[in-house]
């Protein structure tokens, strides 16, 4: 199936003398040339997130001369971001990611315009925001935002480039419900339903090899330039799958699913994706303790079994003194339940409190009715009780 598309953007009227000098290596490419560079100059591209995928994509789109770049990010730079989010530096830790990204972009190319949207993308603002741009790029790492971006792009009539990464793997594609010649597909044609909560970890939980971000982001940026200028064949209707350990790329055809309901409105995506599973939320009700409460329990000599449900690689980085490692996967399979002591109150913890709530549901179903989990996980414990603790 051919996915050649007409140019998404009309060309600007002219290039300045400075622009001709700056983009000269583009101008001498026959398929791109002056016309293509004028289209890049006139383009308005919105990038969702200045994180692992957004960071290198923003840098290359800016260097390529995309005339207006919008950045959606409400987060601040954390030291753990620097391993892969190359648009930020040590001096930016604690700063707004959007502002840090803007400063890096301006340092590379002062000829373009950068618009900041320091907000949380939500059903109340997504469609109106998308209508201000020609093209959207989504590299977010949670399913609620991915489905929101997809549905808002459909309602706004906008194409978007999507990418994702996990450990040593990456994926990328182009979605555009209203693409010409009946080529339209959207994210729900590939993934009609989100996976069960907890099945697919985020980068914070599962990790990612930092340089994988550059590989996938370069594909995303390339697709953006192809869409804007109308050159080549895009990934519309195809999923690109990258495996860094095998150093392989393969593509999978995406076809329109006629059974997928038509998107007519935005919904509550946290609820739709079940960010926390229903049984986990139910188990945590009345069975959640704060770091302060755990400290008091430990100091009082209460009989506890402190259970770390994270993966062994996380345990090796840091753990709470006196804890026992029983990964959530072993608890869910039943193998780890036999390791839980019967004569003490089990206190489960993970990194941020999500996985421990999910493990708590399995523990309670097994008869450990007095088991509890730690609110906010080891991150909250470190911040409130042990600020000198190493954190990842």
From Swiss-Prot:
Q: What's a GO cellular component annotated to this UniProt protein?
A: peptidoglycan-based cell wall
Which parts form a coiled-coil structure per UniProt? none
Instruction: Show the stretches that span the lipid bilayer.
Output: 45-65
Q: Which domain of life is it from?
A: Bacteria
InterPro entries with a match to the protein in the record: Rhodanese-like_dom (IPR001763), Rhodanese-like_dom_sf (IPR036873), ThiF/MoeB/HesA (IPR045886), ThiF_NAD_FAD-bd (IPR000594), Ubiquitin-activating_enz (IPR035985)
Among SMART domains, the record links this protein to:
RHOD
Q: What family does the entry list?
A: In the N-terminal section; belongs to the HesA/MoeB/ThiF family.
Give the protein's biological function: Catalyzes the conversion of the sulfur carrier protein CysO to CysO-thiocarboxylate. The reaction is thought to proceed in two steps: first, ATP-dependent activation of CysO as acyl-adenylate (CysO-COOAMP), followed by sulfur transfer to give CysO-thiocarboxylate (CysO-COSH). The sulfur source is unknown.
Its recorded name reads Probable adenylyltransferase/sulfurtransferase MoeZ
Report the source organism.
Answer: Mycobacterium tuberculosis (strain ATCC 25618 / H37Rv)
Kindly list the organism's lineage. Answer: Bacteria, Bacillati, Actinomycetota, Actinomycetes, Mycobacteriales
């Amino acid at each position: 199936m051919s996915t050649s598309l007409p140019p998404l953007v009309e060309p600007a009227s002219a290039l300045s003398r400075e622009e001709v000098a700056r983009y000269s290596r583009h101008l001498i490419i026959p398929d791109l040339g002056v016309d293509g560079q004028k289209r890049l100059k006139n383009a308005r591209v919105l990038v969702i997130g200045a994180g692992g995928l957004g960071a290198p994509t923003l840098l290359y789109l800016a260097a390529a001369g995309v005339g207006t770049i919008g950045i959606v990010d409400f987060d601040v730079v954390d030291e753990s971001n620097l391993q892969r989010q190359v648009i930020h530096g040590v001096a930016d830790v604690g700063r707004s990611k959007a502002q840090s990204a803007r400063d890096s972009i301006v340092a590379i190319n002062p000829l373009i315009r950068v618009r900041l949207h320091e907000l949380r993308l939500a059903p109340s603002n997504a469609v109106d925001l998308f209508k201000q741009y020609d093209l959207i790029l989504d590299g977010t790492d949670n399913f609620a935002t991915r489905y929101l971006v997809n549905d808002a792009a459909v309602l706004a009539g906008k194409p978007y480039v999507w990418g994702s990464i996990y450990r040593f793997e990456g994926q990328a594609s182009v979605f555009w419900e209203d693409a010409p010649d009946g080529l339209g597909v959207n994210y729900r044609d590939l993934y009609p339903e989100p996976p069960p909560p907890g099945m697919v970890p985020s980068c914070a939980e599962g990790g990612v090899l930092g340089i994988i971000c550059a590989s996938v982001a370069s594909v995303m940026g390339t697709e953006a330039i192809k869409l804007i200028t109308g050159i080549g064949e895009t990934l519309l209707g195809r999923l690109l799958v990258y495996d860094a350990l095998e150093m392989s790329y393969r593509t999978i055809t995406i076809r329109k699913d006629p059974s997928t309901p038509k998107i007519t409105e935005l919904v509550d995506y946290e609820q739709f994706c079940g960010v926390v599973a229903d049984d986990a939320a139910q188990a945590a009700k009345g069975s959640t303790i704060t770091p302060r409460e755990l400290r008091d329990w430990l100091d009082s000599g209460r009989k506890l079994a402190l259970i770390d449900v994270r993966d062994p690689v996380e345990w090796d980085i840091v753990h709470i003194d006196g804890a026992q490692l029983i990964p959530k996967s072993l608890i869910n399979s039943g193998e780890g339940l036999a390791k839980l002591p019967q004569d003490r109150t089990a206190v489960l913890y993970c990194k941020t409190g999500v996985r421990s709530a999910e493990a708590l549901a399995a523990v309670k179903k097994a008869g450990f009715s007095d088991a509890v989990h730690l609110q906010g996980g080891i991150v909250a414990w470190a911040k409130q009780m042990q600020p000198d603790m190493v954190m990842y």
